[in-house]
Amino acid sequence: INTLILGRNHGTVMIAEESTAWPKVTGKVEEDGLNFSYKWNMGWMHDCLDYMKLDPYFRKNNHNKMTFAMSYNESEKYILVLSHDEVVHLKCSMLNKMPGLEGDKFKNLMAGYAFMMGHCGKKLLFMGQEFAQKQEWSEERELDWYLLENPEHKKIQNWVKELLHLYRRN
C-alpha cells in the first residue's frame, strides 16, 4: 500500500509509528521492507525526554540516553517526534517536564530543541511546543496563544524559528 500511495501522490509522506525493533520499516519492498518514508524514533524520544527531565546534577551518569540513538541511526530513515502523546494524560507540557525554576525550564527546553535539530533524522514538533505551551494539550480548548505576549515564550518561538531555518539551510 505504501508503494501504491507514494507512487500515485507526489509529495506524500508515509510515517510508521512503530515501537518495536521490526527491521526494514523504511526499506524497499524488493528488499523485504515495508516502504514507509520514515519511522518514528520512539527510542530517541523516550531517552531524550527521560534525560531532559533529570536535574542537571544527575545527568552526568545518564549521557547515554542522549547518544544511544546514534548507534542505530543508519538502520532506518527516522523522524524525531515530540508528539501529542507526550503532553496529555497528566504527562505535563514540554515546558513543565523540565527541571528547575521557570527560567531554568525555558533554558532546558531550548537546549533540548537544539539537540533535536542537530540529531540525525527529520523533525516534528506537536502544536504549541514551538512557543512552550504551559498546559497539557486538550482537544477541548485552543492553544494558549496569549503566552506569546510573555518575552520568554516569544523567545522560545523565535529560537525554534531560527533552529528550523538553520536546519533547512543544511
Give a label for each model feature.
Residues I1-E140, L147, H165-R168:
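Conserved alpha/beta catalytic core and glycan-binding cleft of carbohydrate-active enzymes
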Residues P151-N170:
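Catalytic cores of secreted or luminal carbohydrate-active enzymes
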